[in-house]
């Protein structure tokens, strides 16, 4: 089975998967990780050290932090010079297509109906995981073209009077940038972002990053902070 592991409270170290994907690491959950990225990397190093030597760890080649992790068997995925590489990426109005190479050998081509560069990384890492698990990639390829995404991940929730409304749970500056990039090129209309900050600690510690996350947006509306049990 497949599962998404949550690193927010450090309990990720309790798990020992056969195939593990670490997409990217940045300062977050700073209410728990008091030393920021340093603490996060220490937790992930402990997590990796606990998994069996036969396990495969797939890390994002384009993320400096993930590339600093050490494992018994590490493979990389990314846009260039990785074990699994996405090449010839084409963003179109209704889909995204790209070719997948494994160790510079053509493996397959993929079509996804999700937008944004981050979803290329997501799909690439999923395919790499399946390939490492011994699954025939040509058998699973058609399913990538029909997966419409998760709820609250650039989810279309309404359309009226020429306005299209999308809902996304992004609450980290990098996530916000990725979400807003999904709207680029969709049409020539204005992009209005309504943002509710999540946790006072995150807003305080990543303030400068938040200021730069909305560049290119026509209008930003900021609501009250969702405290998530924190005191103001």
Language-model regions, residue ranges each:
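A short, aliphatic-rich alpha-helical micro-motif
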Residues: 14, 48, 214-215
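Short beta-strand segments
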Residues: 2-4, 23, 60, 194-196
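Acidic, Mg2+-coordinating active-site environments of NTP-dependent enzymes
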Residues: 17-165, 188-189
């Amino acid at each position: 089975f497949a599962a998404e592991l949550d690193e927010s409270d450090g309990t990720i170290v309790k798990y020992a998967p056969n195939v593990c994907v670490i997409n990217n690491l940045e300062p977050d959950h700073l209410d728990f990780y008091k030393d920021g990225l340093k603490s996060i990397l220490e937790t992930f190093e402990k997590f990796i050290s606990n998994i069996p030597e036969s396990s495969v760890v797939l890390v994002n080649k384009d993320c400096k932090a993930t590339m600093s992790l050490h494992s018994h068997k590490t493979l990389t995925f990314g846009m260039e010079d990785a074990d699994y590489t996405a090449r010839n990426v084409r963003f179109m109005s209704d889909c995204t297509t790209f070719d997948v190479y494994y160790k510079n050998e053509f493996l397959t081509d993929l079509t996804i109906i999700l937008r944004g560069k981050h979803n290329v990384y997501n799909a690439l890492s999923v395919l790499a995981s399946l390939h490492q698990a011994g699954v025939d990639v040509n058998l699973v390829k058609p399913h990538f073209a029909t997966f419409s995404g998760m709820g609250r991940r650039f989810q279309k929730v309404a359309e009226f009077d020429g306005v299209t409304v999308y809902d996304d749970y992004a609450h980290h500056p990098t996530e916000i940038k990725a979400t807003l990039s999904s709207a680029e090129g969709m049409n020539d209309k204005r992009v209005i972002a309504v943002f509710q900050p999540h946790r006072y600690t995150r807003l305080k510690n990543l303030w400068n990053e938040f200021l730069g996350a909305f560049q290119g947006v026509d209008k930003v509306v900021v609501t009250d902070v969702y405290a998530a049990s924190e005191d103001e």
